Amino acid sequence: MDIKFFDDPLEQPRPREDVRIRQIGLFLYPDLRRLAFGIELTPFRERPSIEVNITNGEGKPAGSLHVIETMTPNFSLTMHLRDDTIANPYVLTVVLYYSWPEDRERIEVERREVSFDVAQPGELLFKFDA
């Protein structure tokens, strides 16, 4: 008996070396101090971790976020910008990685960098080939 859980072969869970970032979404709140960070990954067999860092126009850290072994390929979280005053342009760096087995160093699968300005509330969407 052959049971198929996935109809679309492109949507089948992938091994860790084939997991990719499909898109990153940012929604800047009206206070210009918070942003919703959203990400969509390809389906995965093993749960990846994600590191997100934001640096300001002066190259200083403006925010960070770590997701350890996510269970879902699509989610969003709110980040807070640390800057007292806006320092455009900001650079968002997202690293998709695996941190186990524990006796090995972190295995980086993909890294994406996007630049954006904090000027007005709204949504930004960055799509990638996966």
Each language-model region and where it sits:
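Short acidic/polar inter-strand loop motif in beta-rich domains
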Residues: 96-112
